């Protein structure tokens, strides 16, 4: 009996490794075949590089006020001109990239953690749990994202962390739907059934077996969502619901 159990365990491990290798291969194939994913990744990478080296790229302090130089046009001294307070717009655009990136990454991480966990629970347990999570997700999804985000901003207020939480919560449904479909396609596979027979807990099966085999679509979704979240942050800042002045953000710069 012990030998049979060991054989089943080894077979289950082989199946897991083979499935993960297949998913990795499919992930890279999908990544390089979808132009929108590549474009999203390149844009995010460019923003990351600008944000990292912002201190070296900014010719002026983005918050430095110079009344004699206000409302100037583009010139050799000020590539994008200056605003009504004489602040260099090129420096503020670069500084805004750092703020937007921080908000975007935090929001995507929050959305991914909450949405992936709820989607995995819904798909794995099914029944009433699935109905509650799925129906709640659908109810949130029918509300326009910007309207939902504005409502949450009224509750949480401004600030980088609060804005990231607001955008993270509003994007949670994307991960719930994606992860639920992944779990439904994985949980009946042989190595999951073998794990149940070996006495593995539901927690271990979900986070040690199902989640690692779903990482590829999660990464693709996160890559796409970073860009979308940055645009949402810009929209909220444009409406005056984002980060308070004088902190430079892209939306606030567009708003003037």
Summary of predicted features, one role per range:
Residues 26-30, 88-95, 131-141, 152, ...:
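Short amphipathic alpha-helical coupling elements at transmembrane boundaries
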Residues 152-155, 182-183, 231-256:
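Glycine-rich helix-loop "coupling/hinge" segments at transmembrane-helix boundaries
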